[in-house]
């Protein structure tokens, strides 16, 4: 029999032995504990298991497949990646991969990354005032891995080999050394496989597809110094190049065939710049308006 003893339980157990005048030298401690527990009611307050805590946290962070993509892309950007490739299928419900050429992680760093509240972004509360990264709480990867089957492959510049770690429901299944370039690839499969109540609230594949595509379009417009490649079922949807102008990037993202033209203007302290569509372009739809 295994049980957890804390100071309060030790005190209560000692009180029970004294009150019932039990000769502890003639009876096993486990037998005393059984008698003690038999007379106790089940406590109403108890500590949740770590996997349950992570699954609850996942409900706040992982609302839908696009939220998984968002967290992983932000991690890539925080890792100083210049090329980010995203691939997904079935609205991201069964397969999402995000691969980058960022600084990568060592084996030890991977294992820290899958622990809650482990982060490279801050070390003390004062760091929040100068924070410039997308994330800092260290909750994304452990939350995602608690409700999906996740494979993390990564290598940094200082290591000769990379590391590949497979997880399912937050549990480590395997670890192996691999040959790969510096950077990180994270594959998320079977999202909410162990939380069926969450999966049934996901929308159709097409709706979830659109959320992912819209998200990467927004990232592409905000970070025009990053090359984004977006694939659906291994088929390229769009690809933006590094250091494109806003007009060039809009044309690439929406496949508008040179419909957008760049402009710059300066008047004192005001220097607007952007892109406008050519006069003969009259197609108006929801995706024409992006707020970031």
Which residues fall in each region the model found?
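Compositionally biased, intrinsically disordered low-complexity segments enriched in Pro/Arg/Gln/His
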Residues: 8-9
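Ala/Thr-enriched low-complexity intrinsically disordered regions
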Residues: 14-15, 30
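Compositionally biased, low-complexity segments
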Residues: 20-21
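Serine residues within intrinsically disordered or low-complexity segments
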Residues: 24-25
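Short, Lys/Arg-enriched N-terminal segments with co-localized hydrophobic residues
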Residues: 30-39
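N-terminal phosphate-binding caps/lids of nucleotide- and nucleic-acid-binding domains
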Residues: 40-292
């Amino acid at each position: 029999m295994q049980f957890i003893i804390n100071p309060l339980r030790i005190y209560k157990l000692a009180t029970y032995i004294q009150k019932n005048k039990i000769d502890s030298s003639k009876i096993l401690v486990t037998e005393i504990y059984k008698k003690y527990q038999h007379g106790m009611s089940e406590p109403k307050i108890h500590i949740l298991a770590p996997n349950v805590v992570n699954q609850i946290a996942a409900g706040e962070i992982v609302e839908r497949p696009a939220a998984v993509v968002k967290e992983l892309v932000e991690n890539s950007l925080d890792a100083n990646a210049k090329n980010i490739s995203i691939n997904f299928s079935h609205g991201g419900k069964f397969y999402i991969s995000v691969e980058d050429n960022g600084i990568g992680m060592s084996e030890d760093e991977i294992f820290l990354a899958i622990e809650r509240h482990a982060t490279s972004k801050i070390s003390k509360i004062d760091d929040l005032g100068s924070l410039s990264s997308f994330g800092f709480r260290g909750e994304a990867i452990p939350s995602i891995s608690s409700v999906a089957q996740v494979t993390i492959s990564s290598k940094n510049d200082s290591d000769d080999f990379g590391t590949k770690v497979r997880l399912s429901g937050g549990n480590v299944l395997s670890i192996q050394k691999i040959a790969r370039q510096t950077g990180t690839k994270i594959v998320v499969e079977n999202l909410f496989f162990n939380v069926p109540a969450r999966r049934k609230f996901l929308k159709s594949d097409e709706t979830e597809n659109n959320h992912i595509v819209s998200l990467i379009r927004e990232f592409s417009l905000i970070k025009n110094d990053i090359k984004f490649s977006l694939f659906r079922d291994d088929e390229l949807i769009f690809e933006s190049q590094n250091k494109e102008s806003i007009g060039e990037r809009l044309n690439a993202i929406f496949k508008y065939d040179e419909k957008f033209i760049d402009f710059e203007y300066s008047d004192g302290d005001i220097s607007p710049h952007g892109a406008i569509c050519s006069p003969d372009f009259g197609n108006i739809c929801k995706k024409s308006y992006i707020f970031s």
